[in-house]
Amino acid sequence: MAIQNAYLQGVYEGLAKRNPEQKEFLQAVEEVLESLEPVVAAHPEYEKAGLIERLVEPERIIMFRVPWVDDAGKVQVNRGYRVQFNSAIGPYKGGLRFHPSVNLSIIKFLGFEQCFKNSLTSLPMGGGKGGSDFDPHGKSDAEVMRFCQSFMTELYRHNGPDTDVPAGDIGVGGREIGFLFGQYKRIRDEYTGVLTGKGIPFGGSLARTEATGYGLCYFAKEMLADAGKSFEGQRVVISGSGNVAIYANQKATQLGGKVIAMSDSNGYIVDENGIDYKVMKEIKEVKRARIKTYLDYVPTAKYVEGSQGIWTVPCDIALPCATQNELRLDGAKALVANGCYCVAEGANMPSTPDAIAYLQQNGILFAPAKASNAGGVATSGLEMSQNSLRLSWTFEEVDERLHNIMVNIYKTAAATAEKYGMKGNLVAGANIAGFEKIASAMMSQGIV
């Protein structure tokens, strides 16, 4: 599907002309603009106010060098980013990603998606994203600490609890957040909720670690229930083996599903008896080892080289939880051919546009990431609330709030899709629902 509306088409063409090399960012923008056609057609005042032009252009982009010294005494230099995309509904909020693939296009796409995701939570959070091409894998704790301290030595001047509140993402877990927070506190000499995903002893929220994976399953549960189905007795395939995948495994299992396959960038494992999330957590979070190590714990499991093959494993429910554009058209065809009837995205934009189109054409229940993986940032918002109130809620309290937020996101996306004559199209429903709140705020605040 291509953009039909002349105004939206003109905005997209102008954006593509200015950013021809930023394919991930352009992909994210195109998907959203396609969904917004009926809304923009009903509101000609948006064009007069240049609303869409402002929506797709970040308010601020920060790029900086990050020099640090490795354990051999050699100076290394990486590049750091922070894209402060939109603050119409609250302070910039979004994670930091440390991975060799990180570039400006990826950070801009993530920041753009974050705007709509944060809007859907109904919490007062704008959209932003950041990171670096630094690879924490294979680095010592001391090297990671030195890098994080150097990174924050520049980033601190752009952050603040009411300005910009980063969190974790790929390559940025509790260890990295701790180092970043420590350096911020040292430089600013103040103790504020400037980062989320912190450790429990220094202002973190219970259930934050589990939130994205749990939230994904809560969203999928609602979507399945509307179709008269549930997780009970279903075969579940989860790509990835990081934070999102591990806790999606735990919650899917608690809801009655059986997770039979998981992956990392090297390959995937199949365990017909159900993959034990505790074993996966030990391998990935404690040993920081490759997924093949699962065979040392469960010799009856099978390991296959190459992560793409995971989509050929017969399943009922697929949860892509690894990285962007991992589920391509061939993977979507394999899922449909093998009887999969539900795909819910746990990673950010893990499915390519042609894969999504194929799944929708074949009647597959499809949950888009900006709605179904919003649990992480929702609980980050709850962590910000606890920090502001100087309170700490119990795990059960946070989990209940998370569950309610995910149920409301599903209902809002589904109702919005139906309102605009696209019943069941949660991609359009989530895009429009997220946009409407941001658009209303931007129109109220003038040309800024």
Residue ranges and their predicted role:
Residues 1-206, 437-446:
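N-terminal ligand-binding/catalytic initiation module
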Residues 84, 129-132, 171-172, 242, ...:
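Glycine-rich beta-alpha junction loops
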Residues 267-366, 371:
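Rossmann-like adenosine-cofactor binding region
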